[in-house]
Amino acid sequence: MDGIFGSTGVWFLIGAILVWFMQAGFAMVETGFTRAKNAGNIIMKNLLDFCLGTIVFVLLGAGLLMGEDALFGLVGIPNMGVFTDFANYDWSNFFFNLVFCATTATIVSGAMAERTKFLSYCIYSLVISAVVYPIEAHWAWGGGWLSTAEPLFGTTGYFANVAYIDFAGSSLIHFVGGISSFIGALLLGPRWGKYLDKDGKPTLVRKEAKYV
């Protein structure tokens, strides 16, 4: 069978559900290495990564990722296919990319823990979910320029005619999330009050949130 109930669609859904549970894993890891007073803030930010990300991904991100190529394969053409082509829409692929979008955003929350205000983090989450992840994921997973580039390993052998493959998101998700985390930590600086006070003097390490 084709579509969401075909073998590919079912496999996409199973994989997507497993990835979705990574949100809980991220929440436990991050609350485990932050102070107990910030545990609620961390969990709420991880929850909003998915909630806010879903809204902007439906409205804009899905079109940029899965839409028809534009600008030499750099972006997809934004569309409202999720609403206008409801019956024939590729829902399994949509959900698969939605949870990966949330994962990309949540990777950064660990680096931003105890460094940002809640509103500032929400703005970041909207931007990476609506624009950053959809555009760079389109390059390889949406038929963009990386997936249609000249073969990297020639036209013969096991990797014949392969341009670029990211099987599980090592570059599109984890590399992008890591780079975003590094930039954010570099711009914001250390977590004042956890190890050093504002005068640079060591502080007593307080009780951590023992969720992990």
Model-derived features with residue positions:
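Hydrophobic alpha-helical transmembrane bundles of multi-pass membrane proteins
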Residues: 1-212
